Regions:
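Short, acidic, Ser/Thr-enriched surface-loop or helix-capping motifs
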Residues: 3-4
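Flexible mid-to-C-terminal extensions adjoining Fe-S/redox cofactors in radical SAM and related proteins
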Residues: 14-125
C-alpha cells in the first residue's frame, strides 16, 4: 500500500495506478476501491511464492486488473500505460520463471494458512 504525493492510493510504491485519492476518500474507501478489491481477489498472483509480484513476474494479471477496474496512471513525472510498464518486465520475467520454478519445485512448502486463500488454476506454475 502506498499513497503518493498527490494523495493517490496505490497498491505498491512501484505500481502507479489508482482509482481513489486520500484527499477525497477515507482510508477505508480507498482500500475498497476496485483496484484493491481485484488485488485481494487475485491473490496469490502465482502459486510459486518466488514469483509473487503482479508487475514483475505476472504482468498479464496486472494488465487485466488495471483494465477491468479502470484504474488510471498516477505517475506524477511520467504517466504510462500499464502495457508500457509491464513490457519493461518481460525479459526479466522470462529469464526468472524457469529458475524460480525449478527452485520452487525442488523445495518443500507449508500449506496455505491464511483465510482468504483461494487456489486458482490459472496461477499454477
Amino acid at each position: 500500500f502506498h499513497i503518493n504525493a498527490n494523495g493517490d492510493a496505490e497498491p505498491c510504491v512501484f505500481i502507479h495506478y489508482s482509482g481513489a485519492n486520500i484527499r477525497e476518500n477515507t482510508l477505508l474507501e480507498c482500500l475498497k476501491q476496485p483496484l484493491f478489491m481485484a488485488y485481494r481477489d487475485n491473490q496469490p498472483f502465482n502459486n510459486n511464492q518466488l514469483r509473487p509480484c503482479p508487475m514483475l513476474e505476472n504482468s498479464e494479471i496486472l494488465q487485466r486488473i488495471v483494465k477491468e477496474t479502470g484504474a488510471k496512471s498516477t505517475d506524477l513525472q511520467s504517466p504510462e500505460t500499464v502495457e508500457h510498464l509491464c513490457a519493461k518486465c518481460h525479459e526479466y520475467a522470462d529469464k526468472w520463471a524457469p529458475e524460480a520454478d525449478k527452485l520452487w519445485n525442488e523445495s518443500t512448502h507449508m500449506e496455505h494458512a491464511y483465510e482468504n486463500y483461494k487456489p486458482k488454476e490459472q496461477n499454477k506454475c
